[in-house]
């Protein structure tokens, strides 16, 4: 069985198209996108609407999940940072974890072949 890794990135929504394009160029075969809301070290943010200030506790983000061969993890991380990093608070986070097994339900392919 080959070594596989899940790369999960929490990013600003407007980077999705560029991120999809960049990861596809690397050979990433698929990804799952989930709309999420959260806050980090700085908490929420304050926005003004029609002269009134509102505290937004949870900021909208996207979670991009993909499973790749472990040998591609550093390239995938670099690609995500290339597209998503602005240098400002709120750029997001990347989490990497090991995947024990992947099975394509339709064909019963396993491991890297299932990606």
At which residue positions do the language-model features occur?
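Positively charged, small/polar-rich N-terminal and surface patches that mediate targeting and assembly
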Residues: 1-115
């Amino acid at each position: 069985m080959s070594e596989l890794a899940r790369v999960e990135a929490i990013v600003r929504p407007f980077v999705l198209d560029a991120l999809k394009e960049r990861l596809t160029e690397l050979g990433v075969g698929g990804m799952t996108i989930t709309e999420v809301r959260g806050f980090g070290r700085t908490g929420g943010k304050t926005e003004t609407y029609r002269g009134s200030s509102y505290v937004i506790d949870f900021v909208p983000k996207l979670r991009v999940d993909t499973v790749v061969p472990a040998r591609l993890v550093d390239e995938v991380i670099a690609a995500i940072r290339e597209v998503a990093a602005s240098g400002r608070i709120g750029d997001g986070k990347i989490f990497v974890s090991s995947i024990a097994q992947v099975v394509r339900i339709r064909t019963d392919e396993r491991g890297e072949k299932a990606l």
